[in-house]
Design a protein with these regions (language model features):
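Nucleotide-activated sugar donor-binding and catalytic core shared by glycosyltransferases
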Residues: 1-236, 241-369
Length: 369
């Protein structure tokens, strides 16, 4: 009898990392794969689903304008109960640290359905940084029966918290699997024509805890560095959040060396990352993606749940201070030795076979489901 494996996700970052797993599981003869999306993101989620040719079996469609954490939480909790009761999965897989992840795990706990946590064990141990993600992943860690940790450090965190060693599997990160399918040699985009022979900087900035003064600091530092380096051009696919857009327009709107564009598909995002000179971000996933192509990453956050990259030298945690961002952005543009140290550091996040490992475990390894 086939094992019924249900995957639930709702945001663009989750979809990027879960869609390759969906497609891998669908190749396994002993597994029935069911996909439920919550629609926590809408347009950006749909772009990823199309890229990986994943068609959800269920769509909760909870997104609404101006939604709060309260809206997302109650919207998912009210709708997912019926789906879980109808499907009766043997295991539900959730990913990472979103509100979708937390609420789905909570619903499964209420219904006593086993939870498998993909990208388990990331920690900052400050529940307000990143917010609400750090709380979400710690809470899911209490509920989850099976834990797919991307690195040995993530496994150590789980062991330190009292998780049974037999419930933890070090698999690598599924985002590396995703990039093997999306990055191509003959990629073309009009923005790359605009960049030409200039050094390209890829920027993302959207985190909730960076809204307000921290984000203004980030944008001011970027503007200063661009003004001092006429051979550099930046591409910033901006988040839909109107607060982010307002800050970017105020600080970067008349800067000729940066193109602020609408959100791009994962296919474009990965190909931009593979071709950039370096990346400035407050994202989580990009901290794993860019090192796969030897691209240094300046992390514009006060904490990171991915210290492996900092330890390996692929990431530099620069915080949200204007001067610190300015210092390191300038250093990597002007100092070839500093740049080479980061560009040539080993990627600690996996080899592109994480989905196979997870599927093998689900297909063969769980005698209890």
């Amino acid at each position: 009898m086939k094992k019924k494996v249900m995957l639930v996700f709702g945001t663009r970052p989750e979809a990027i990392k879960m869609c390759p797993l969906v497609n891998e599981l669908k190749t396994r003869k002993n597994i029935e794969t069911i996909v439920c999306v919550t629609g926590q993101h809408r347009q950006m989620l749909n772009q990823v689903l199309e890229t990986f040719n994943v068609v959800p079996d269920y769509d909760l469609a909870i997104m609404k304008q101006g939604q709060t954490l309260f809206d997302i939480t109650t919207g998912i909790l009210e709708k997912i109960k019926a789906v879980l009761e109808n499907v009766k999965p043997d295991i539900v897989l959730v990913h990472g640290d979103t509100t979708t992840t937390f609420v789905t795990a909570l619903a499964c706990f209420y219904l006593q359905i086993p939870v498998g946590h993909v990208e388990a064990g990331l920690r900052t141990y400050n529940i307000y940084s990143p917010y609400p993600e750090e709380f979400n992943r710690q809470a899911v860690g209490i509920i989850s029966k099976y834990n797919f940790a991307p690195t040995e450090l993530a496994k150590k965190h789980l062991l330190d918290e009292g998780k049974d060693a037999t419930s933890i599997y070090v698999t690598g990160n599924t985002v590396i699997d995703a990039m093997q399918h999306t990055v191509i040699a003959d990629y073309h985009h009009p923005e790359l024509d605009w960049v030409g022979d200039s050094r390209m900087i890829f920027i993302t900035a959207h985190r909730r805890e960076n809204l307000g003064q921290p984000m203004h600091n980030m944008f001011r530092a970027i503007r200063r560095v661009l003004n001092e380096h006429p051979d550099v051009k930046a591409i910033y696919p901006i988040h839909m959040n109107p607060i982010v857009r307002k800050a970017a327009d105020e600080e970067l709107g008349d800067c000729k060396q940066i193109h602020i564009i609408d959100p791009i598909e994962v296919f474009d995002c990965h190909n931009f990352e593979a071709r950039c000179f370096l990346c400035l971000t407050d994202s989580g996933g990009i901290q794993e993606e860019c090192p796969s192509y030897g691209k240094p990453v300046l992390v514009m956050r006060d904490t990171t749940e991915r210290p492996e990259g900092v330890d390996a030298g692929t990431l530099k945690l620069v915080g949200t201070s204007e001067e610190k961002i300015y210092e390191w952005f300038t250093k990597l543009l002007d100092n070839e030795e500093e740049y080479a140290k980061m560009a040539h550091a080993a990627n600690p996040y996996g080899d592109g076979h994480a989905c196979e490992r997870i599927a093998d475990i689900l297909e063969k390894g769980y005698t209890s489901i």
